[in-house]
Amino acid sequence: MQEMLRSVYAFNADSGNRKLLKHILRAMSLIDRKLFTYFQNPYEDNAIPIGRNQTISQPSTVARMLLLLDLKEGDNVLEIGAGSGWNAAIISFLVYPGDVISLDRIRELVDSCKKNLENLKQNVEDDGLIARLEDLYFLQEDIFTERGLWEKSFDKIIFTAGIPDKKTEKKIKDIAKELLNENGILICPYVSGPLVIYRKKKKLIREETKEQYVFVPLLEGTEE
């Protein structure tokens, strides 16, 4: 695990937010990645498969996205693309006592996230860590077609799958307009390209990272 954490630090040392990076590294050390994947080498700083043609991002990329979100204690966060649940658990640790809602369109992955979270709780003796995960919720929902969450608002929104086309990017911009609180941040990658960042300050401000990434595509509809 230490080698993974050193790699995460090296990739993100120039982020300009050393305090948050320190908290992210602590969260990654406490929320054991091996409990969220069946992969043989869970501590490699690589994306790894979790089944159903899905992957979870490499830890360095996870940290970079969370740094760009500028997570703060008390933030209410929406994640689209629950994956294995590891990213959401880290977010929950960082924003406690804020709520974290993590969505996935595939029920099997949602059920797996819930099991992984319970497995983590059973394998730690730190009541403080467990308390920081109590307001984390995994739901099956397609954010584009099922608008059950559209009456809520969030301080931060993170997509963990990539924008495949302009039509989808327009929908993501609409989500930023409708669901972000003032001063909120939304981050979403392309399938291949930079990370897109929307900041809501009376109007939406769009930015892109210089770095390029590769993600599985963001899809619509639900599956079992």
Where are these regions (language model features)?
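Conserved nucleotide-cofactor-binding alpha/beta core module
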Residues: 70-205
